[in-house]
C-alpha cells in the first residue's frame, strides 16, 4: 500500500520536511514587551516532540505597535531576539524538528485586550493602548479606534522593520519565514478594496493595492537567505 502524501517528505526550497504535517502559528499572549517567556519554552517544546514535519512560531510583530495585544510576541529589539534565542536553544538541545516563524504587523487591528483578561476589544490610549496605523483612516468596525492613515515614510519604515526582523531570524537559525497577510492585519488591509480607500499609488487598482505588500515581501526576501523558504499566508 502506498504511503499517503501526508506522510511523505516534501522539499520546500531546500528545506526537506519528513512529512507534510505543519503546526500552524498560534498566538499565546504570554510575551512581556514582545519577549518570549518560560511559557513559550513549554508550549513550543512539547510541540517539537509531536512528530510533525514543521513547527511555526506564533504571529511575531516586527515593531511594538504591530502587536495584536500587549501579550504578543515580537522581534523588533535585541531583547526580543535574546529571549527567543534562549527558547530555541532549550528546544534544540532535545529536538531536531524544523522551526519557522510567522512575521506580521496587526495594523488597524492592533492594541486589543489580551484574550482571557476579562475585557474585549481595543484598549484605550489612557489604559495602555497605542496608536494604530492602516492604509486609510477606517476602523475595523465602528467600535474600533480609527487608525492613522500611513504616509510613504510610514510604509518605508515598516518595510525596513520587516527586513530587520528577517535578519534576526537568520541569526536565530530559523528554517522558514511566513509573512502574515491575512485576517485583516496590515498587509491584508492594503489588499482589501474595503479597507484601502487610498487615492495614491498604493490604492485603487489591484496593482496599486499590492504595491506595499510586495515591497514587504521583496525586502524580506533580500534579507532572508535564498536557500531558505519564504511564504505568505
Segments the model singles out, each with a brief description of its role:
Residues 104-168, 172:
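Non-globular sequence segments
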Residues 56-81, 103-121, 178-204:
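Glycine-rich, proline-tolerant flexible connector loops at the mouths of alpha/beta enzymes
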Residues 40-63, 171-176:
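Catalytic domains of carbohydrate-active enzymes, especially glycoside hydrolases
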Residues 23, 47, 51, 91, ...:
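Conserved, mostly hydrophobic/aromatic
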Residues 20-22, 54, 96-102, 176-178, ...:
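Structural preference for beta-strand elements that scaffold enzyme active sites
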Residues 72-99, 193-230:
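Alpha-helix-loop-beta-strand connector modules within alpha/beta enzyme cores
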Residues 1-22, 91, 221:
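N-terminal amphipathic alpha-helix/helix-capping segment at the start of soluble metabolic enzymes
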Residues 36-47, 157-167:
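Short, acidic/polar
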Amino acid at each position: 500500500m502506498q504511503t499517503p502524501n501526508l506522510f511523505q517528505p516534501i522539499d520546500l526550497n531546500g528545506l526537506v520536511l519528513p512529512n507534510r504535517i505543519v503546526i500552524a502559528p498560534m498566538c499565546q499572549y504570554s510575551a512581556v514587551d514582545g519577549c518570549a517567556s518560560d511559557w513559550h519554552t513549554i508550549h513550543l517544546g512539547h510541540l517539537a516532540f509531536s512528530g510533525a514535519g514543521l513547527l511555526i512560531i506564533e504571529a511575531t510583530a516586527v515593531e511594538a505597535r504591530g502587536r495584536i495585544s500587549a501579550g504578543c510576541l515580537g522581534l523588533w529589539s535585541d531583547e526580543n531576539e535574546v529571549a527567543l534565542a534562549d527558547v530555541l536553544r532549550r528546544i534544540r538541545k532535545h529536538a531536531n524538528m524544523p522551526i519557522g516563524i510567522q512575521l506580521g504587523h496587526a495594523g488597524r487591528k492592533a492594541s486589543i485586550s489580551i484574550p482571557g483578561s476579562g475585557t474585549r476589544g481595543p484598549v484605550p490610549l489612557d489604559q495602555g493602548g497605542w496608536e494604530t496605523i492602516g492604509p486609510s483612516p477606517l476602523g475595523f468596525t465602528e467600535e474600533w479606534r480609527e487608525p492613522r492613515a500611513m504616509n510613504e515614510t510610514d510604509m518605508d519604515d515598516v518595510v525596513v522593520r520587516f527586513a530587520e526582523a528577517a535578519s534576526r531570524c537568520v541569526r536565530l537559525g530559523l528554517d522558514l519565514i511566513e509573512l502574515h497577510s491575512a485576517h485583516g492585519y496590515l498587509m491584508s488591509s492594503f489588499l482589501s478594496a474595503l479597507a484601502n480607500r487610498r487615492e495614491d499609488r498604493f490604492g485603487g487598482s489591484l496593482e496599486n493595492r499590492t504595491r506595499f505588500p510586495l515591497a514587504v515581501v521583496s525586502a524580506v526576501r533580500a534579507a532572508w537567505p535564498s536557500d531558505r523558504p519564504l511564504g505568505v499566508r
